[in-house]
Regions:
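Surface-exposed alpha-helical segments enriched in charged/polar residues
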Residues: 206-209, 241
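Extracellular/surface-exposed low-complexity segments
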Residues: 235-247
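Concave beta-strand-loop units of leucine-rich repeat
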Residues: 1, 7-10, 15-21, 27-33, ...
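Active-site-proximal acidic segments at structured loop/helix or strand boundaries
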Residues: 161
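Extracellular/luminal ectodomains of secreted and membrane glycoproteins with large N-terminal domains
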Residues: 200-201
Length: 247
């Protein structure tokens, strides 16, 4: 069955949650001028049409297990995309050029993501998916500051060209190689439960920047830096003094 909303051209924000027996939802006709949508926990939703909702700025579509794809139209103002816990295996976001924050976590079969070249994306959350490589994704995100890609199938991760990265969660993959920008100061670096050997960990430690001593007077508390690398083959034999010398 379909959910019919009527004609609401003046609606700016739409929230629809926990609805059953609805397989298709077409927002193009009902609310073409909507700027924010929150579509969650539709147990039976298989098809969602938002191609003609050109004014969308925030897209939240989550916890719809039977929803395997979304066809995006031109959404030049959309800045945030929250689409976790769906059934996506592949997704193209090329028609959303203004995106800054992406959350596609817990799409358990998602293994392919297309982005525009040289986006302004600052945060990507794809933990709990099925990615074997995200090299092409990283190339499109020179402004990336936060990456969460834990619980995937990654064997290598190279962020050498992502100079703004400050938070990285890549634990519970199969990483044998992890590279970060030379001299980078990551406030959070969680790379435990991978396959990083002694040399890989030492190389990672060498790449990290020197933590500066806080000034005697400062208006805000000094930053804290956290790293977790246990449960790797090289965790016991790596040179922890490299890290100690940077503090």
């Amino acid at each position: 069955s379909d959910l019919h909303l009527g004609n609401m051209p003046g609606m700016k924000s739409l929230v629809l949650n926990s609805i059953t027996d609805t397989r298709e939802l077409n927002l193009n006709t009902f609310c073409p001028n909507v700027e924010s949508i929150n579509i969650g926990s539709f147990a039976d939703l298989e098809h969602l049409e938002i191609e003609d909702c050109f004014r969308l700025r925030s897209i939240q579509v989550y916890s719809n297990p039977k929803l395997t794809s979304i066809e995006f139209g031109s959404h030049p103002e959309a800045e945030s995309l929250y689409c976790s816990y769906n059934g996506f295996s592949s997704l193209s976001l090329k028609s959303l050029p203004a995106l800054r924050d992406i959350d596609l976590s817990s799409n358990e079969v998602l293994s392919h993501l297309e982005l525009n070249e040289k986006t302004s994306i600052s945060a990507i959350l794809i933990q709990g998916c099925a990615f074997q490589s995200i090299t092409d994704i990283l190339k499109c995100c020179p402004s990336l500051r936060e990456l969460s890609c834990s619980y995937n199938k990654l064997t290598e991760l190279d962020l050498s060209d992502n100079s703004n990265i400050s938070e990285l969660r890549c634990e519970h993959n199969q990483l044998t190689r992890l590279m970060v920008p030379q001299g980078s100061l990551l406030e959070h670096l969680y790379c435990h439960s991978n396959q990083l050997d002694e040399d890989a960990l030492n190389t990672l430690f060498d790449s990290l920047g020197q933590v500066l001593e806080p000034a005697i007077y400062y208006p805000t508390p000094p930053r804290q830096y956290r790293i977790s690398f246990n449960d790797n083959p090289g965790a016991d034999d790596c040179n922890r003094n490299i890290l100690n010398d940077k503090n």
